[in-house]
Every structure is written in C-alpha cells, then in structure tokens.
Amino acid sequence: EALNYFFKLDFIESNCVKAWRGIGWCSFISLKYEQAMKYYEKIIEHKPLAIDYMNAGHVAWVMGNIQKAAVLYGKAITACGTRERFLEMFHKDEEPLLKQGIREEDIPLMLDLL
C-alpha cells in the first residue's frame, strides 16, 4: 500500500526524491531488488544523502554484488562524515538485512571490507 502511495507521489510530482526514497525502501523490503536499485540510482544521480548510498549498498549486497555494495557503503561513510555515524545508521538496518537473506555472520565481514 505504501508503495502505491509513493508511486502516485512520483507521478504527481516529477523528480520527487522523497518519493523515490520511499519507492526504493518499500521495493527493497518487498523483495523487488531491481526496482529498488533503479530508484536508488536515480536518487544518487540527483541529491543523495548518506542513507541513500547505504540503502543502495544494502540492495547491491542482497543482489549478490558485494563489490558494488562496498563501494556504496564507502560513499555512505564519506557522506556521514565519520565511520562511527555510518555504523550507527547501519546497525539500525541489521534486522531488514537479515530478513532479506544476509547472514548474521556476514555483517562483520562486510564492515571489515570498508
């Protein structure tokens, strides 16, 4: 239902980054990874925030593209200003990552890559 709301908002308001963020996240948790990545890439081309890079990293990771995920997470760290702020943000998303099939033991390994 939320996904439909964000699609309507995107239709009404062109280049609505807020709608794209909603579509990206709702698509991610709905297992629509290609759609999620499409919207995160649009955001990154326009006005990305640290969370946009991080969420795009999540999508890349669950799609099996570890290298792309690491690059996007690196950009998120830069946008956050500090690794600590990134980690705080990242740890809030551990549950959704686990629900998407990321193994708990792989999380520290990914963070070590960064």
Task: Give the role of each language-model region.
Residues 80-114:
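Terminal, low-structured helical/coil segments at or just beyond the last alpha-helical repeat
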